[in-house]
Curated annotation (Swiss-Prot):
Domain of life according to the entry: Eukaryota
Protein name: Pro-MCH variant
Region called NEI-like, residue ranges: 44-56
Disordered: annotated span: 28-62
Region (Melanin-concentrating hormone-like): 60-62
PANTHER family referenced in this protein's UniProt entry, alphabetically: MELANIN-CONCENTRATING HORMONE, PRO-MCH-LIKE PROTEIN 1-RELATED
GO-annotated biological processes: chemical synaptic transmission
A single GO cellular-component term on record: synapse
Pfam families xrefs: Pro-MCH
Organism: Hylobates lar (Lar gibbon)
Stretches the record annotates as NGE-like: 23-41
Family: Belongs to the melanin-concentrating hormone family.
GO molecular function, one term: type 1 melanin-concentrating hormone receptor binding
Length: 62
């Protein structure tokens, strides 16, 4: 059960970048996890690329 919980947490980390990158389904799950780390760095720096991904994510939530 502990392994399943840990796997569920990593799935959340993978799903979030997938929601932000709906058009880029070609990205494998491993790259999705790495992209999560890059996204956090972009949030700290406030790059325009990161802000451009937010509207795409909102579309997915709608």
């Amino acid at each position: 059960k502990h392994n399943f919980l840990n796997h569920g947490l990593s799935l959340n980390l993978v799903i979030k970048p997938y929601l932000a990158l709906e058009g880029s389904v070609a990205f494998p799950a491993e790259n999705g996890v790495q992209d999560t780390e890059s996204t956090q760095e972009k949030r700290e720096t406030g790059d325009e690329e990161n802000s451009a991904q937010f509207p795409i994510g909102r579309r997915d939530f709608d």
